[in-house]
């Protein structure tokens, strides 16, 4: 698995977010609704500087999770790694392919987290820019359902990949 594509996707998402949110910054009130209940009604506020600061901090966190974690895994002693059948998957002959898979896999996970963040932050931005006709909160639930479906499929794929070592061809 090649990790260049998810890196490119993440970079494009970051560029989009930077352009999109920076164009909205000046139009936002100084104090913005930043937290909403399940029905989309605001119930928490903060300054717009703090609001966008949280977005930047969460962007950095998603980079660390998606791109830093796989680098850390490669440097950590094998006994500290929690991976099914790790003796096989992290043996010298399989370690490189395993780490490359994890690097790409966590990069895609980071992209999904970041996309969800963008959708949720955009909901808050649009709610502040158009308080008389805020966006429909159900879109957030659909986004959350799609993300949870992705995570479920992501975990299944992870366990399918590492759940057991491939069978050796006996007698060939």
Predicted regions and their residues:
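Membrane-water interface of transmembrane alpha-helices
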Residues: 24, 64-86, 155-162
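Alpha-helical transmembrane segments
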Residues: 11-12, 47-69, 139-149
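Active-site and channel-lining beta-strand-loop segments
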Residues: 22-53
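Loop-to-transmembrane boundary segments
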Residues: 93-113
């Amino acid at each position: 698995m090649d990790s260049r594509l998810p890196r490119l996707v993440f970079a494009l998402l970051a560029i989009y977010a930077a352009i999109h949110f920076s164009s909205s910054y000046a139009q936002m009130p100084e104090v913005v609704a930043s937290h909403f209940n399940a029905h989309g009604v605001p119930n928490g506020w903060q300054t717009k500087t703090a609001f966008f600061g949280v977005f930047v901090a969460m962007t950095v966190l998603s980079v660390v999770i998606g791109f830093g974690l796989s680098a850390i895994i490669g440097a950590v002693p094998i006994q500290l790694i929690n991976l099914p059948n790790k003796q096989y998957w992290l043996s010298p002959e399989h370690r490189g392919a395993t780490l490359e898979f994890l690097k790409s896999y966590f990069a895609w996970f980071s992209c999904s987290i970041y996309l969800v963040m963008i959708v949720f932050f955009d909901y808050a931005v649009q709610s502040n820019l158009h308080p008389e006709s805020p966006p429909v909160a159900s879109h957030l639930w659909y986004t959350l359902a799609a993300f949870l479906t992705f995570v479920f499929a992501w975990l299944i794929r992870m366990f399918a990949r590492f759940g057991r070592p491939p069978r050796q061809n006996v007698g060939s």
